[in-house]
Design a protein with these regions (language model features):
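Conserved NB-ARC/NACHT P-loop NTPase core of NLR-like innate immune receptors
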Residues: 1-191
């Protein structure tokens, strides 16, 4: 256990290939498990929550998990809690899935609007209309890696370096090398 007074960190990487990592239930469960190990205060709250759900034999609802997280964030005198949601755009955006991206966005909006004194959030995502619509009004600080000037230039520099320093560079005609560079930059799509 960590002592009270030290910051806590919980992160969640959204992954469309893993059902447990693309929705609200997985996100909340992951945050709570990580926080459980970081402070005696968190331990007590989460252990009580676990006991209320028959020691894990009765799965909690998403609403119950969200309320437990809010209870942790409301504990008095705690140091900052950093919650990181990485690759939010990988959360499924289809209503047939139990917990969709819209539910995760709703939770983020709710947590930010509640203005918990100790909450710090970082959300990463590719630009998507539904995500931008919810997050833009909430953002205190935004860093875009999708602008044409920065990331694309880095990718272009790297591709040129690799092709121009390749041992078989002399085998290619200059126009073919330039065409290969142009196609690779275009197809990289910022990745």
């Amino acid at each position: 256990m960590r002592k009270a007074g030290l910051a806590s960190l919980a992160f969640f990487y959204c992954d469309f290939r893993d059902d447990r990592k693309k929705g609200l239930h997985g996100l909340l469960s992951s945050f709570l498990v990580q926080l459980y190990h970081q402070s005696d205060s968190y331990f007590d709250v989460i252990y009580d929550f676990y006991s209320e759900h028959d020691r894990g034999s009765r799965p909690p609802s998403d609403d119950a998990l969200a309320e437990c997280l809010k209870e942790l964030l409301n504990l008095p005198g705690l140091a900052p809690v950093y919650l990181i949601v990485d690759a939010l755009d990988e959360c499924t955006n289809q209503s047939v899935v139990r917990s969709s991206r819209a539910e995760v966005l709703s939770l983020i909006k709710e947590l930010v609007k509640a203005k918990f004194h100790n909450l710090r959030m970082c959300v990463t995502s590719r630009p998507e209309l539904d995500i931008n619509a919810v997050l833009d009004p909430l953002i205190f600080c935004s860093i875009s890696l999708h602008d044409e000037s920065g990331q694309k230039r880095d990718i272009e520099d790297y591709i040129k370096f690799v092709i121009n320093t390749h041992p078989k560079k002399g085998v290619w005609k200059e126009e073919h090398r330039k065409h290969a560079i142009d196609v690779l930059i275009e197809k990289s799509n910022g990745m």
